[in-house]
Amino acid sequence: MQEQYIHSEIEAEVQKYWADNKTFEVTEDPAKEKFYCLSMFPYPSGRLHMGHVRNYTIGDVVARFQRLQGKNVLQPIGWDAFGLPAENAAIKNATAPAPWTYENIDYMKNQLKMLGFGYDWSREIATCTPEYYRWEQWFFTKLYEKGLVYKKTSAVNWCPNDQTVLANEQVQDGCCWRCDTPVEQKEIPQWFIKITAYAEELLNDIDNLEGWPEQVKTMQRNWIGRSEGVEMTFKVKDSDDSFDIYTTRPDTVMGVTYVAIAAGHPLAEKAALNNPELAAFVEECKQSGTSEAELATMEKKGVATGLYAIHPLTGEEVPVWAANFVLMNYGTGAVMSVPAHDQRDYEFAKKYGLALKAVIKPADGEVDISEAAYTEKGVLFNSAEFDGLDFDGAFNAIADKLAAEGKGKRQVNFRLRDWGVSRQRYWGAPIPMVTLEDGTVMPTPEDQLPVILPEDVVMDGVQSPIKADKEWAKTQVNGQDALRETDTFDTFMESSWYYARYCSPKANEMLDPAKANYWLPVDQYIGGIEHACMHLLYFRFFHKLLRDAGLVNSNEPAKRLLTQGMVLADAFYYNNEKGARVWVSPLDVTVVEKDDKGRILKAVDTEGHELVYTGMSKMSKSKNNGIDPQVMVEKYGADTVRLFMMFASPPELTLEWQESGVEGAHRFIKRLWKLASEYSAAPATEALDVSALNADQKTLRRELHKTIAKVTDDLGRRQMFNTAVAAVMELMNHLQKAPLASAQDKALMNEALSAVVRLLYPIAPHVCFNLWRELGNSGAIEDAGWPATDESALVEDSKLIVVQVNGKVRAKLTVAADATKEQVEALGLAEDAVRKYTDGVTVRKVIYVPGKLLNIVAN
C-alpha cells in the first residue's frame, strides 16, 4: 500500500472501475427489496455550483448506504433542459438554444462523474429530446380527451420586452425579474390543466405524506387553501346585471357598506366607457403585478364606478367601487366590503369616506371601531333577525335564508387555481393541439406525434422562431389544412413526470407499467424547499393523473422528502471610482485581521483594495461568492468535498462554506489512510477471538459497535449525516491510540478498519473503495454489505456510578453491570469519601437511578 494519499490517482482509478463494470446500472429484481433514490435533476446551465453538489452528495450517500443494506438501488440522473436561460444565452452568443444546451450537458456530466456520484447513466434523459417530450404531448392529448384540459382567455402578466407571460413570482416591484421592463396585464388565450379537479384529494392526501417535512406540508395546505363559505348574488340597481361574491364570514354580511370589484371586471370596464377617471384607473391597474405579496404591500386605491348594488338580505343600496386589491382571476372578481370587521376594508373606507356599520361585538362587552376594525368572531347585533347568534349559528341561518330565497348557496372554495401551461417562448415542448380550417380545435393525432421542435433556428431576441416561421405551423389533419399551436409547455410539465420515465427511459410508450410499479413510488426524494408549492405540487398532481390513466398503481410519487439547506459563503466588496460595488470572490481575498471570536474585521483582495465584509450569504453570481466545485475537487479531492458537505451542517439547515473546514476534512481522510497504511504493513494473521479479549480490547470493541449502531441509525432513520461523520471521527481517535502489539490487537484493528471504511463509504466512496481492497478484502466494497452491530459487544461488564450526598458529588464507583440496588448502596456507604459526610448523621433516604446515580440524603 502506497504511503501517501494521492486523491487524484485514487479517484480516477476508482471511477474507471465503476464505469467499466457498470457498477450502478440496475434492472428490476423481484427477489430483492428495491430502493429508488432521486435528487431533483439539474438545469444544464453550464457549470455545477455548490448547491448542486450538496443536493447530489446527500442523494448519493442515501443511495450507497441503501445498497450496502442489500437493496436493489436505482439512482438515475438527467437534465431539465428546456427553459428561458437557453434562449437568452443563444441570443447573447448568436447561436441556437439546442447546441448551447447539449454542450452544457456534456460539461456538467463530466463534473458529476468527477464527484463520484453513483448514477445509472444508462437511464439518462434530457427533457428537450423528442424521445422524451413525445410522451408528454401524448399524455396531454389524453387529458384533453378526458376533459381535464381546456383553453380560455386569461389575464396574464405580460413583459412587452421579452414578449412572454410571467408567473406572479417573476414580477418584482411591477417589473419583469429578467429585464426590469414594467409589466402589463394582457388577456390572451391559454391552455390550462384542471388541477382544481384534484384539489380535495391533493389536500387530503397530504396527511399520508409521513416522510415529508411538516413545513412543506403546511405550505402545500396553505397553497391549496380550502375554505368553507357562502356565495351570494348582488343585483345591480336599475340594470339586468348581477355579480357573485364569496365570503368565509357570512356572519358579517349585514355590515356590508360597499362592494369592491376588480378593475378588469366586466362591470368596471362597462362603467369606464362613460367615466374618464375610472378608465384611467382601469389602465393603471393593468400595469401592476398580480402576486399576493405585491397586493399585500401596495397602496390600496379605488374609484367609484357610479353603480349601486342591492344587498341580497336588506335590499339596501351599496356603492360599487373598482379597487386595485381585487383580482379578476381570483375568486369571482368581486368582494363584499365590511369595513367595521375587516382591516383592509376599514382603511379603504377611511381613505374614501365610506360608511362603517358594526354588526359583531364581543360576547362579554361592546365593540370599539374608532381606531381599527374589530376582526374577531363574536355575537351579532344590529343584524335584524340574526341578533344574538354566534358565528356558527349566524353562518347557518344566513346561508339557509340566502338559499331559500335563491340568492346564495354554501360553497367550498380553493385558493388553488388551474395550471396555465402555455408559454409564448420557443425553447419548450410544442403544445400538441391544432386548429382546422373550419375553426375546430383538436389534439394532434397520435400518428403525428411527436410535434418536433426545430432545433436549427436563429434567435432574434424578439419573437419565438416557431411563431415567426409561418410555414412551421402549417400541417394537415384528416385531409384538412390545419395550424399548429405555437405556444410551448411550461417547463414544470417536464419535471412533473421525469421521475416515472426513469423507470423505463427507452420504452416505446410513456411508461412500462410493470417497471414503473416495481420502482415507484420514489423512496427518497431530495431537493430545495423553494419547490414546495410549484414543482412538488405538480409532481403529486401528475402522479395522480398517471394513476388514473392506469400507468401507476400508487397514490403519491415519493415516500420521503428531504429538503436540503442552501450553501452560504463569505461575501466581500469594494466601491470603485464611480461608487459602484465590485464584489470580490472569496478565493481572491486575504483576511488581515479577526476579532477574538474569529469574526473578520479587515480583508484585502489581490489588487490591494480594502474590502467591506458583508457576512455569509447564499452563493450567487451577483455577489461573486460562488466557489467552483471543480477547483475544490482538483485541490482536495471529491471525497474531501463530499465529507465536508456532510459534516459541516445537518442536511436541512444552511451550510457555511469554510475552506478551513475543507482542509480539516482532508486531514481526516489522510489520518484514515495513515492508520490503514500502518496496519497493512503488519496485518492480522489470526481471526478475532471475542472471548479472549482483555478489558481494553473489549472497551475498544464496544466503542466500535456503538459507532456502527449510531451511524446506521444516523444515515438511515434520522438522516443526520453530520453526526454520523462525527461518530466515526471520535472512533478514529480511539483507534489511533490502540496498540498493534498482539495478534488480537491486530485482529481487532482489522475488524474496526473494515467497518470504518464501510461506514464512511457512502460519504467518501473512492478512498473507502481503495482501502477495502488494501485491507485484504476480496470483491468490491459495493457488494460487501453493511457492518452489523454485535449487540453482545455493547454489554458492559461494569458501570460507573456517581455517588452524591445531599445532591453534591462525593465519589465515583465502578460496579458490576448486574449489581443490585442493595450492593451499590452498601459499596457507596462504605466509600471513605462518602463516610466523611455521613458519619455522625442520620441517613434519611437513599435514591438509586440504576446504572447511573446513587444519592444519599442525610442530616
Swiss-Prot record:
Substrates-to-products reaction catalysed: tRNA(Leu) + L-leucine + ATP = L-leucyl-tRNA(Leu) + AMP + diphosphate
Motif ('HIGH' region): 42-52
Disulfide bridge positions per record: none
SUPFAM superfamilies on file: Anticodon-binding domain of a subclass of class I aminoacyl-tRNA synthetases, Nucleotidylyl transferase, ValRS/IleRS/LeuRS editing domain
Keyword check for Cell cycle: no
Binding, ATP: K621
EC numbers for this chain: 6.1.1.4
Transmembrane segments: none
Keyword line: Aminoacyl-tRNA synthetase, ATP-binding, Cytoplasm, Ligase, Nucleotide-binding, Protein biosynthesis
Cellular component, GO annotation: cytosol
Family: Belongs to the class-I aminoacyl-tRNA synthetase family.
Protein name: Leucine--tRNA ligase
Organism: Shewanella amazonensis (strain ATCC BAA-1098 / SB2B)
